[in-house]
């Protein structure tokens, strides 16, 4: 429906969660609308993961060498910062994150500890990786996003869905 003042566009969304062999979870989002004009949209997930034990015992690696610069309110400024810390496996001991990174095409993220490994493999429609370590240090948020935070205002990665397209 289009009666939400924060997002006044009607649309239909469907989510398909598919568990495949070898513990592979595939999540597919499909959005469609019948408005006469294109509508803005962005998609992303905000899952928290734990591998058991504190985050300080985890390692993180992902295919990104660029971080989006944030202002004091954690809104992207449009500037980019070189950040190659996670191109190789990096311990998360005493590392606190609340950052957005630009993933390389076909990039992935690997979270591991001495017992488990989690691979997050977003497709090309999710070029932003948001990583957050809460103060309690018992989990980590690894979010694949179609655009940067606040993209309805800053336009970074904002997508436009054409009428009757998916």
Positions of predicted regions on the chain:
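Beta-strand secondary-structure signal
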Residues: 14-16, 26-30, 59-61, 108-110, ...
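A short, structured loop/turn motif at beta-sheet edges
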Residues: 18-24, 51-56, 133-137
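Glycine-rich active-site loops that engage anionic ligands at enzyme catalytic sites
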Residues: 113-149
């Amino acid at each position: 429906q289009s009666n939400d003042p924060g997002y006044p566009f009607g649309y239909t969304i469907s989510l398909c969660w598919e568990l495949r062999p070898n513990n592979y979870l595939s999540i597919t989002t499909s959005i469609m609308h019948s408005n006469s004009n294109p509508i803005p949209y962005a998609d992303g997930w905000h899952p928290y993961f734990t591998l058991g034990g504190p985050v300080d015992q985890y390692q993180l690696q992902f295919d990104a060498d660029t971080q989006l610069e944030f202002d004091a309110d954690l809104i992207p400024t449009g500037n980019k910062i070189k950040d190659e810390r996670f191109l190789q496996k990096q311990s998360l001991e005493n590392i606190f994150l609340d950052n957005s990174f630009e993933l390389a095409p076909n990039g992935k993220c690997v979270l591991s500890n001495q017992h488990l490994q989690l691979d997050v493999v977003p497709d090309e429609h999710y070029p932003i990786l948001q990583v957050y370590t809460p103060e309690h240090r018992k989990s980590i948020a690894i979010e694949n996003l179609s655009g940067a935070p606040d993209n309805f205002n800053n336009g970074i990665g904002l997508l436009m869905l054409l009428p009757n397209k998916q």
